[in-house]
Amino acid sequence: MSFPPHLNRPPMGIPALPPGIPPPQFPGFPPPVPPGTPMIPVPMSIMAPAPTVLVPTVSMVGKHLGARKDHPGLKAKENDENCGPTTTVFVGNISEKASDMLIRQLLAKCGLVLSWKRVQGASGKLQAFGFCEYKEPESTLRALRLLHDLQIGEKKLLVKVDAKTKAQLDEWKAKKKASNGNARPETVTNDDEEALDEETKRRDQMIKGAIEVLIREYSSELNAPSQESDSHPRKKKKEKKEDIFRRFPVAPLIPYPLITKEDINAIEMEEDKRDLISREISKFRDTHKKLEEEKGKKEKERQEIEKERRERERERERERERREREREREREREREKEKERERERERDRDRDRTKERDRDRDRERDRDRDRERSSDRNKDRSRSREKSRDREREREREREREREREREREREREREREREREREREKDKKRDREEDEEDAYERRKLERKLREKEAAYQERLKNWEIRERKKTREYEKEAEREEERRREMAKEAKRLKEFLEDYDDDRDDPKYYRGSALQKRLRDREKEMEADERDRKREKEELEEIRQRLLAEGHPDPDAELQRMEQEAERRRQPQIKQEPESEEEEEEKQEKEEKREEPMEEEEEPEQKPCLKPTLRPISSAPSVSSASGNATPNTPGDESPCGIIIPHENSPDQQQPEEHRPKIGLSLKLGASNSPGQPNSVKRKKLPVDSVFNKFEDEDSDDVPRKRKLVPLDYGEDDKNATKGTVNTEEKRKHIKSLIEKIPTAKPELFAYPLDWSIVDSILMERRIRPWINKKIIEYIGEEEATLVDFVCSKVMAHSSPQSILDDVAMVLDEEAEVFIVKMWRLLIYETEAKKIGLVK
C-alpha cells in the first residue's frame, strides 16, 4: 500500500525547494501548513480526493524546480485571463422547478460572476430568463460550452450571447492567441498548445463533474411532480388579470367630498356633460368598491401567509428542541458508557494489584527456600536470583508497556468521541444558520414586495393627480374659450344690427355699389368658365399622373382604380343636406369616426381646416347714377340682393340663376347672439348659417313692393380657397395610398415571413425613430416593466438581417404565447415602413 508524501517534507528522490518557493500541491490533498500550526485530526472520509477541485495537478519530475519567474507561459496566461473585458450572457428557458440559488451556483461553477440579473414580473414572480455578467471572457466561453442545452428538470437551459459580445469574445481569443505566441520562446513546439488544450479539457471535465454533483443534490426538487398542472392556464389568466388591475388602477383611495346627483344637477352645464359626469362618478364608485374588495382579499391572503410562516417557525422551533433533547440523551449515554469504562479500568487495576501481590508472595517463598539451602549452592542461588530479577524486571517493563498502550488507545477513543461531538455541533450550527438565512430571506422578500407595492401605488397616485390637474386646466380653458366665443357673437350681432338699422339705400348705395350688376355677373361668369376649364385640364393631368404612378407600382387594374377614385371624389363633392341640426353627441361621434379613418398604422394626421371667410364691405368713393329700375325700390324691399351687397337668387328671375356645379362656393361665417337663434344649442364647432336666416326680418316688411336692382361689388377672396382645396386633395391621395399599402401586406404568418423585405432601407435612423420605440412599448406591455437589454437584443437581431423565424425562436423563451403575435406585428411594421419609404410616403 502506497501513501502520499509528508505534507511538510519533500518526497524521497526529489531535492528540497529553494527558500521562498511554495511546495507543489497534489490533487486531493490540502495545502501544506507552516510549522508550529496546531493540527486537528481529519477523518479519512474528508481526506478523500474530491473531483470538484479546480487546481491543476503539477507533474513531479526528478529535477530541481526553479522559481515562479522561470515559467513565462503560466504568467502570460494569468495576465490574459485577468485583463479581458467583462461579458454578459443571456440565460433563458429556465425551468420553474429550478430555484434561483441552483442557477447562481451553476453559473458560479464556470467562473467569477460579477452580477446575476433575474427578471421579475409585475407580480413579483421570477421570469424564465436572466442576464449574467462574467469578469473574464474565459468564464463566458466555458459557460457557453458546458451550460448550453443542459437538461434541468423538464427543460434544456439556453445560454447564448448577442452579436456584440460574440465579436468581443472573438477579438479576445485572437488577442490571447497572439500574446501566447509572442510570449513562448522559439523552441516551443505545437505540443505545448496541445497540452494547453488538454488542460482546458481536463478543467472542463472537472467542472462538468461538479455540475453533475450539484444537479444530483437538487434532483429531489427538479423531479418533483407539478401540483398545478391542471389549473395552470386558469391560474395564468388570473395572474394576468390581477397584473392588469395592479398596473392600471382606475383611481387611488383619496378622501374627497361626496358629490351627489342633486349637486351635479344644481351646476349649470349642458345635459350631455351632466350625464357624462354622472356616468364617470358611477364608474369611479364601482371601481372603488371593487378595489376595496380586492384589498380585503389581499389582506386575508397576507394574513394566511403570515399564519403559515408562524406555523413553519413553530415547527422549526419544535424540531430544534427535539434535536436538543436527542443530543442531550446522546450525551447522557456517552457519560454512562464513560462511567462503565472507568469501572472496567478500575477492575483491571485491582486484578493487576492482586497478581502483583501473588508474585511478591511467590518471590518471598522462593527467597526463603533459597536461604534454607546449603551454602555450597550460594553461587548458584545468586545467579538464579540475578536471572530471576532480570526476568522480573523484563516482565515489569512488559506490563508497563501494556498499560501505556492501553492508555494510548483510551486517549485515541476519547479524541474520536470529541471529534464526533465537534462534527455534531458544526452540523447543528450550520443547520441553524441556514434556517436563519432562510427566515431573513423571506423577511427581505416580503419587505421588498411591500416597498414595490407602495412605490407602485405612489406612482399611480401621482399620475392620477397629474391627470386630474390637466383635465381641470382643460375644462377651465374650454370655458374661457366658450365665453370668449359668446362675447364675440354678441358683439358681431350688435354691430350688424346697428349697421342694418342705420343703413339707407338712397344715401349709402353709392358708397357700396357701382355699374350694372348684370354686366358684372356676366364678367364673373366668364372668369368662372375659364377657371373651370383650367381646372378640368389640371384634373386630367393629375389623373394621368396617378395612372402612370399606379402602372409604375405594378397595379393590376389602374383604370378601375382611377374610376373608383373619381367616384369617391364625386361622392365627397355632393352637398350634404341636413334637415335638422344635429346634437353635440352625434357630431362628436362622427368626428371620432372620421379621425379613426384618418389614422393609418398609428399615425395621426390633423385634418386641415378650411378658412372661415367673412363678408367684406368695401366703400366706393364715386359711383354713377342709379338706374330707374333701382330707384323704385325701397330700402326694406326683399329683392335679388341683400342690404350688405351679397347676391341672393330670387324665384322670379330664373335667367340669372347659375348651375349648381358652376356656382362659386363662398364660406360665410356669421356670429349671432342668443336672440337670433334661441332654439339652437351651443356647439364646439362653428356652423355655417344660410344667408336667408340672417336677414329674414327684412322679408316681413313691405313684401308687396317691387324689388329694386342694386349695384354690387363681388367679393375677392384670393387664392386661399384654391390652396385649401389642393391641400385636401393631397391629403386624400396620401390616405388612399397608405390604405392600399396596408391592404397589400399579408396577415398570415407563412406569407408574411416569406414576403421579400428590402434590407437596404432598414438603417439605424429607421430603427431609432420607428422600430425601437414600438418594440420598447410592446415589451413593457408583455413583461410589465422596461427591459433595455431585451430590446437591444431584438434590435440587434433585426439589424443583423435575421429571419423572423429565428427571432421568434429566441423571443419565445421569454414571452411564451405572446412571442408569435409580437413578431408578426413587428414584421408587418417593418414591411410597411420599408415600402412607404420606397414609394415616398414617409421621409
From Swiss-Prot:
InterPro entries assigned to the protein according to its UniProt record, in alphabetical order: Nucleotide-bd_a/b_plait_sf, PWI_dom, PWI_dom_sf, RBD_domain_sf, RBM25, RBM25_RRM, RRM_dom
Domain of life where this protein originates: Eukaryota
Annotated stretches, region: Disordered: 1-30, 171-202, 219-243, 280-442, 498-688
Biased composition range(s): Basic and acidic residues: 280-433, 521-573, 590-599
This protein's record includes keyword Transport: no
Subunit relationships: Interacts with LUC7L3 and SRRM1. Specifically associates with functional splicing complexes, including Sm proteins and U1, U2, U4, U5 and U6 snRNAs. Associates with exon junction complex (EJC) proteins, including APEX1, DDX39B, NCBP1, RBM8A and RNPS1. Interaction with NCBP1 is RNA-dependent.
Designated name of the protein: RNA-binding protein 25
Name of the coding gene: RBM25
